């Protein structure tokens, strides 16, 4: 409780804005998916379970809202004027690898979509979705949005607080250590 808030003091005092930054929602999804992906590899899943994610009623509604979100990003926000600072590993990777901003936008939107899928596959309990929703909503008001805000917190939540449990055995510990 040294910070006195969920964000570092510098971010809480200077970076919490009254402007909504729509892209930060997707970037926070991609950062969460980056941390969740190794844990997803430890889950035993069948292909049928993977397909169920696309056909659950709640997830269909989520995909509908997410489609509206992606369309609003394309038409109502300016991708080219985003700052380089922050936004996580995928943003930095795409800046390094892709020079054309149109292709970078397409890759970013695809990353947002796959990040949503990873989160929907991994989490099983509604309370976990509520906790994750908090991070997604608060990211809309933080500028610039840094990956360091999630670094230790998401891992601590996964191991302790979240209801979706992981099974740690020799194979799973090797996978988690590798990442």
Regions found by a protein language model. Name each.
Residues 126-129, 145-152, 170-171:
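Short, aromatic-rich membrane-interface segments at the entry and exit
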Residues 7, 53, 68, 84, ...:
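Extended aliphatic helical segments
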Residues 72-120, 129-134:
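Flexible internal linker/loop segments at domain or repeat junctions
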Residues 2-9, 74, 120, 140-144, ...:
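Structural signature of transmembrane alpha-helix termini at the membrane-water interface
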């Amino acid at each position: 409780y040294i910070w006195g808030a969920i964000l570092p003091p510098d971010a809480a005092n200077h970076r919490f804005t009254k402007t909504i930054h729509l892209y930060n929602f997707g970037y926070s999804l991609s950062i969460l998916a980056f941390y969740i992906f190794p844990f997803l590899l430890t889950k035993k899943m069948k292909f049928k379970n993977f397909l169920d994610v696309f056909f659950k009623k709640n997830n269909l509604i989520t995909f509908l809202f997410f489609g509206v979100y992606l369309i609003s990003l394309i038409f109502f926000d300016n991708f080219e004027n985003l700052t380089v600072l922050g936004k996580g590993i995928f943003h930095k990777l795409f800046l390094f690898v892709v020079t054309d901003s149109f292709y970078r936008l397409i890759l970013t939107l695809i990353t947002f979509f796959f990040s949503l899928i990873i989160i929907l596959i991994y989490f099983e309990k509604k309370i976990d979705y509520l906790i994750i929703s908090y991070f997604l909503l608060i990211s809309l008001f933080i500028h610039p949005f840094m990956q360091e805000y999630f670094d230790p917190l998401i891992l601590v939540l996964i191991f302790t607080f979240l209801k979706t449990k992981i099974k740690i055995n020799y194979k799973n510990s090797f996978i988690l250590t590798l990442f």
